[in-house]
């Protein structure tokens, strides 16, 4: 009886099913977060997706692909944040020198570029395997985990390099920073991704 979940397709207007306004989200403000309420909602067999008690399999058919999608969008935003940080470090001067020449800033930029490249390679490899049909859950989890955490780091460091100006809404950095937070939660939290990765590592050893 473990993990017995069934997936259903619920039509709007089904008796007992209500959609109402949700909460305002800090991240991704361009869409609505709606609340789905079920009150004695009964559904016919025809609205079962897949097989009864096989809801996890249904979710698995699209969850891996969406994790790669999340990883890819995170790479784009991380690249944009790094671009702003580089431009500002080359333009802004303190004590008669560009701040990008100061070790405290230059090391940040190097780490940001290195982590972005690592996340990109993980994501590209997972996408390549996905197209070939050889991708594993761990491949997709590694890509999602690395890309989301790299985006968070780069967004934070880009703001740090800009100082107080980085938090102003005249620049896109504060939005990238806000949006980065939810990426480590949806499509499986960072903790879930680590669980999936370690589970695949231990499985051949019988653990």
Give residue ranges: language-model regions.
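FAD-binding core of flavoproteins
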Residues: 1-87, 97, 190-207
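Conserved catalytic-core motifs characterized by acidic clusters
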Residues: 46-63, 88-102, 126, 160-176
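C-terminal helix-coil-helix/basic helical segment that borders enzyme active sites and/or dimer interfaces
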Residues: 86-100, 113-146, 159-164
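Alpha-helix capping/hinge segments and adjacent helical runs
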Residues: 28, 134, 141-207
């Amino acid at each position: 009886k473990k993990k017995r979940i069934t997936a259903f397709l619920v039509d709007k207007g089904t008796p007992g099913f209500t959609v109402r306004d949700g909460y305002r989200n800090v991240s991704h403000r361009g869409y609505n977060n709606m609340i789905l309420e079920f009150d004695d909602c009964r559904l016919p067999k025809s609205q079962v997706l897949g097989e009864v008690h096989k809801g996890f399999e249904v979710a698995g058919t699209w969850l891996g692909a969406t994790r790669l999608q999340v990883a890819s969008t995170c790479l784009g935003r991380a690249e944009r944040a790094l671009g702003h940080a580089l431009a500002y470090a080359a333009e802004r001067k303190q004590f008669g020198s560009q701040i990008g020449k100061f070790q405290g800033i230059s090391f940040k930029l190097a780490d940001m570029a290195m982590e972005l490249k690592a996340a990109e390679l993980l994501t590209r490899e997972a996408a390549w395997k996905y197209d070939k049909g050889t991708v594993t859950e761990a491949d997709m989890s590694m890509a999602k985990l690395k890309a989301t955490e790299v985006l968070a780091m780069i967004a934070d460091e880009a703001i740090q390099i800009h100082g107080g100006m980085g938090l102003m809404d005249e620049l896109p950095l504060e939005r990238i920073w806000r949006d980065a937070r939810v990426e480590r939660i949806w499509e499986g939290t960072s903790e879930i991704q680590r669980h999936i990765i370690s589970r695949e590592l231990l499985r051949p050893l019988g653990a």
